[in-house]
Structure formats: structure tokens, C-alpha cells
Amino acid sequence: MSQYPLGVNSEVGKLRTVMVCQPGLAHERLTPDNCDELLFDDVLWVEQAQRDHQDFVEKMRARDIEVLEMHESLAETVKNPEALKWILDRKITPNLVGLPIMNELRSWFEGLDARQQADFLIGGVSVLDITPDKFSADVISLVRATQGDLGFVFPPLPNTQFTRDTTNWIYGGVTLNPMYWPARQQETLLAAAIYKFHPRFAGKVKVWWGDPDKDYGNATLEGGDVFPVGKGLVLVGMGERSSIQAITQLAQVLFAEKAAERIIVAAMPKTRSAMHLDTIFTFCDRDLINYFPKMVDQIKPYSIRPDESKPNGLDIREERKSFVDVVQEALGLKELRKVATGGNSYAADREQWDDANNVFALEPGVVVSYDRNLLTNKLLKAAGVEIVSIRSSELGRGRGGGRCMTCPIARDAAY
């Protein structure tokens, strides 16, 4: 399969290359006691989740889409000794794992094969992995005393399943996102390593903003809030996970690099059900959106444009029209067709919670959607959308659908 230029130029143009992350060891570490802390609503039947995820992957590959899997890409990355050292220098530190275990942990880790290293980097290293055949008795005793019998030396990252959020490609470059919740902050380090060292990406990636070595404080950004829709326009949700501190820094960089001309900020209610803009609003075609009116109608839109006469070079203005109307006008569309979440108020709330509005476009008018959202899918089909259905019973337990589970790396323009 030929390699396409890196860059995402729309929400619905033909998808060429995408990164996903199959459920694995990290999900086997989920328990009823820790799943809430790790941002999952329940534990998964991991084997079924893997089968369902592989079905999702095969359906994309059947449409000539190149699908990269994160465990595989990370394993290929850490075969480079420089890459492994770069990661371990940042993962196995006095502050993260503690001085007493550092040397033995690193020695053990460096002795693993590349796929095992990738599995543990994503899946975490648990107290149960600190065994007498690998570690001294004193280290084992100390780890159990400090972490308990089911604790972690470094924690699992089950939310890598949702590759959308950690990094996002905006036209010709990518952001390495400082995540909102501590449970997700280590994900960015692994994605950054892939882009920095993997043979596919090394020396070819333009980083717009973000650095896993820096503390960004309140400046948090997640890819579920970021939409590079085309025509120099970027939509960015500002709710639970992405902050104005990050959004305005991103705007400065994109304008300075001439990568964007306007940012439309969607100020949203800060709720778990609307954690990202893409949980309530997604594109299905060039002129068709799928949205949850109950939340989208509450969005307060702002526009950010470059203006050197303004403080920090940014002209920020509140829009007087609705978010959807502002997006329609910005794209120069005579009409932006809308499909609302299906059913009465009870059904719509249920389907939105189950990611009915988190569809993922493979090309104009073709989207991936969970099978359980029958009412919304029926309305999308009536609007002329082809539905590529995937099973949701296990994959959806982390609150994310097709858009959440994908990080497009190469996508055509749509306008």
C-alpha cells in the first residue's frame, strides 16, 4: 500500500492512514475497584473487545485504508535502542517509580523483547509482575508494602484505545496533547516516541504544539475536541477536557505557521456525557452533521482570528448566532444538513451516552457507527449516509465510539 503525505485536511475527506490501539493488557488490569479511576465505566470482556476491534480494523482495511496499530508501532519503535532509552528515561524515574526499584526495574525491562516492552508500556507494570525470578526480595517486599497486592509500579493506560485524544493532526502538523486527567497523561509520551523514532515518522513530523517533557499546568487539550474541517478552519471544543489556556496557545502557533485562518471555539457544558465536542457533534458528509441538540444548542461559540494589533496577536469575539449556524457560514455552505440523535428524550439521552453522535467518517457519506444506536443510524441512513456498523457491547465501556478510537494521520481535503 502506498504511503500518503502526513496530514489531515478535513473531517470527511477520504481517509488514507489511521492509528488505532487494540484492547489488551491494560484492559485486563481493569477491576471494579480501579476502573473509575482509569476512566472506564465497567470492566471489559477483553477477548470479545479484541474481536470486535479487529472487525473494526478489517472493515477499514477493506476500503483500502492503511491501519496502524499502536502496540505494533510502539514495538517497532523500541527496537531502536535510542527510542527505548528516551522512553525509559522518562518512565523509570525517582518521582514515578522510586529510587529503590529503578535499577532492577530498568534492567528487567531492557531484557524483554520489543513486543513485551510495548505491551508493558501500554499495559502497565503491576505488583504481580515483580516476582522473585526477576527482582530481589527486598525490592519485592518494598513494592508490596507501598503499592499493595494489586497496585502498579506504573499504571496501565487503557484509554490508549481512544487514540483520538492523545495527539491530533491538524492539516500538515500534529499536536502532542497535555491531557486533562492524570490517568491519561502518560499516553502522550508513547505517541510522541512513535512520531520521533519510528522509521515511518522519524524526521517527517511537524509538531505544532505540545511536549511531553513540559508541565502545561491548566493548558490541557484533547483530540476529541479538535476538528480540522478544511478551508483554513479549525473547530475546537472547550468543555471538560480542553481549556482556553491551551486553545489560545494552539491558535497562536497555527496562525504563525499559516496553517489556519480561523478557530471556532465551542464553549460547552462540562459534563462526562459531553466530555469532548465529538461526543455531541460529528460530520457525516461535506454538508451533513450528526448532533445532540440538547447539548449543542447550549454551546456558546467564539471566533479567534489572527490580528497583530490585538493583545497576543489574537482577535477573539463572541459570535451572536448558534454554533451550527456559525460553522455553516464559515464553510460557505448554503445549508448544513442536520441529523439529530434519534428517538424521544429518553432514547436520545441513551443513544448519545452510547456514542450515537461519535461517528467516524471514512469518506464523504460513509461513517462508522455502533450497532446499538438503531434510531440514530436509521435517521442517518434516511439522510443518505452509508453506515459501517461495529459491535459496541464491550468497546463502548470506556465511553468512546468510532471517532474516539481513531487518530487519522492522512486524510484528503473535502472542499
Swiss-Prot record:
What does the record give as EC number? 3.5.3.6
Catalytic activity reads: L-arginine + H2O = L-citrulline + NH4(+)
Molecular function (GO) terms listed? arginine deiminase activity
Q: In which pathway does it act?
A: Amino-acid degradation; L-arginine degradation via ADI pathway; carbamoyl phosphate from L-arginine: step 1/2
Annotated TM spans: none
User: Which GO terms of type biological process are on file?
Assistant: arginine catabolic process to ornithine; arginine deiminase pathway
Query: Sorted alphabetically, which keywords does the UniProt record give?
Result: Arginine metabolism, Cytoplasm, Hydrolase
Where's it found, cell-wise?
Cytoplasm
Under the heading Pfam families, the entry gives: ADI (PF02274)
Keyword check for Hydrolase: yes
Q: Quick one: where is this thing mainly located?
A: cytoplasm
Q: Which GO terms describe its cellular component?
A: cytoplasm
Active site, renumbered: 404
Q: Report whether Hydrolase shows up as a keyword of the record.
A: yes
Class of this enzyme: hydrolase
Q: Which family does it belong to?
A: Belongs to the arginine deiminase family.
Give the PANTHER family listed for this entry: ARGININE DEIMINASE
Spell out the protein name for this chain.
Arginine deiminase
What is the native source organism of this protein?
Answer: Dichelobacter nodosus (strain VCS1703A)
Taxonomic lineage is: Bacteria, Pseudomonadati, Pseudomonadota, Gammaproteobacteria, Cardiobacteriales
| Gene designation per UniProt | arcA
